[in-house]
Amino acid sequence: MKKIDVKILDPRVGKEFPLPTYATSGSAGLDLRACLDDAVELAPGDTTLVPTGLAIHIADPSLAAMMLPRSGLGHKHGIVLGNLVGLIDSDYQGQLMISVWNRGQDSFTIQPGERIAQIIFVPVVQAEFNLVEDFDATDRGEGGFGHSGRQ
């Protein structure tokens, strides 16, 4: 298992609010909690930035982190990330902030310590562009959206 440096920015993390952990041995994501003093009500269509009380420094350029919505909140309540996916670069060292968007029809209240997003760590390949005049031909060519059909 890869070690990632984590700094606790709020003294409640690790005490009142548990540190992120994998729920099962097969879990890909670690749940992130809302490090709030008071509940926040999010009206339909509204967004807000929610602190996690944690900062990370991945330090390895072959890794990045992605913050993703929790499936139950998205499906049942319309609570997703305002930027859809949060990308955390390996050299970032600041607090993890979660952009929360209520795309649902009803107001939603975020409680202090509530699990509102998840973070996963993914491999990264930094590419260098090779400028060309033309590409070698493929069967697909420039076929884009919907090109391969639905069935």
From Swiss-Prot:
Domain of life the protein comes from: Bacteria
Pfam families linked to this entry: dUTPase (PF00692)
Pathway noted in the entry: Pyrimidine metabolism; dUMP biosynthesis; dUMP from dCTP (dUTP route): step 2/2
GO molecular function, one term: dUTP diphosphatase activity
InterPro entries for the chain: dUTPase, dUTPase-like, dUTPase-like_sf, dUTPase_trimeric
Cofactors demanded by this protein: Mg(2+)
Binding-site residues for substrate, renumbered to this chain: 70-72, 83, 87-89, 97
Keyword Protein transport: no
Enzyme Commission numbers on file: 3.6.1.23
GO biological process: dUMP biosynthetic process; dUTP catabolic process
Family: Belongs to the dUTPase family.
Subunit structure: Homotrimer.
Annotated function: This enzyme is involved in nucleotide metabolism: it produces dUMP, the immediate precursor of thymidine nucleotides and it decreases the intracellular concentration of dUTP so that uracil cannot be incorporated into DNA.
HAMAP family: dUTPase_bact
This protein's name: Deoxyuridine 5'-triphosphate nucleotidohydrolase
Taxonomic lineage from the root: Bacteria, Pseudomonadati, Pseudomonadota, Gammaproteobacteria, Enterobacterales
